[in-house]
Amino acid sequence: MYSLNWPRAYGIPNSTATFKLCPEDFQVNELFEGQFSGEGEHIVLKIEKKGLTTEQVIKSLARLINKPIKLISYAGLKDKQALTTQWLSIHAPGEVIEGIETLEAPGWKILECTRHNKKLRPGFLSGNHFTITLRNVSDESDLIHRIEQIKFKGVPNYFGEQRFGRDGGNLIKAEEILVQGRKVKDRFLKGMYFSAARSWLYNLILSRRVKESSWNLPLLGDVIQLVGSNSIFVNDKSLDEQLLQRIGEKDVSPASPLPGRSKNLVKGTALQIINEVYAEWSAWLDGLEKNGLEEAWRANILYAEQIEYRINQGTVELSFVLPAGAYATVVLRELVQY
């Protein structure tokens, strides 16, 4: 029921490659704008982890410092099968936790420690820097061509398959809550299932636009989003040369909805596509609205910035920066089959 094989913008890559042979093949580092204050109620830790989920690290840390998990916050979840650095915050007003700077456990260790006047939360990140190793690359020239292509044109901004849980398990749970009325007390899990449902519907709309080669074009009635911002406006023209130029300059992008209570912004051709996709999912839409979710917008185009690559005898090391909330795997799937 939940096929995650979304259509590609540039067709199926000629090249195959091996990915994630070991955690070091997928390295992620969080990026922030600005600096931590160095003072305040929250201890802020830079943690390196390998082979663990963010939740597993938080539980381990909580046990070691004898704190409830609810006092520990994060800005973003990081993959298990990866070598990642990320920041966590602990609400500890006026408290010194002895030895925390050198704390470590199997699979993770603390690299830096400071304080801040605010707790970390989703939305705090400006982005993530990825370093990815692809092994046994079968067609280096096709890979290089595709890298150069996405530098300028970007890729469809799908949510990655990890958003939906193993074998789409988060979507199954979402169906149980939204359609069958199942109760889930855990707010974190409930939020995760709702996020998966909204992401699924967003991906369906974006995949339709990719199939029709309109994912990166401004349709009549489209919501347009400023790149790197939540600011939006509605395109009221069928073909706007100035808007096309701004898209080419990476200034704006057509956007698709994350469903919830609608403000009825989208119009015309864009609305027709959305309504056709939504027609099969009315129970989900009703459930999301009843649970208080508000409609939001996500850019159709994802730009990978600061792209660099090195090739050595069939092994390619690729690095780039993505904005917070974007998935490296949706970039990779446009480059190679893995």
From Swiss-Prot:
InterPro entries registered for this protein in UniProt: PsdUridine_synth_cat_dom_sf (IPR020103), PsdUridine_synth_TruD (IPR001656), PsdUridine_synth_TruD_CS (IPR020119), PsdUridine_synth_TruD_insert (IPR011760), TruD_catalytic (IPR042214), TruD_insert_sf (IPR043165), TruD_pseudoU_synthase (IPR050170)
A GO molecular-function descriptor: tRNA pseudouridine(13) synthase activity
Keywords of the record: Isomerase, tRNA processing
One GO cellular component, as annotated: cytosol
Protein EC: 5.4.99.27
EC supergroup of this enzyme: isomerase
Keyword Isomerase: yes
Catalytic activity: uridine(13) in tRNA = pseudouridine(13) in tRNA
Keyword Phosphoprotein: no
GO biological process: tRNA pseudouridine synthesis
Signal peptide positions (record): none
Ranges of residues in domain TRUD: 154-303
Residue positions of the active site: 79 (nucleophile)
Function: Responsible for synthesis of pseudouridine from uracil-13 in transfer RNAs.
Protein family according to the UniProt entry: Belongs to the pseudouridine synthase TruD family.
Name the UniProt record assigns to this protein: tRNA pseudouridine synthase D
Naturally occurring in which organism (per UniProt): Legionella pneumophila (strain Lens)
Gene transcribed to yield this protein: truD
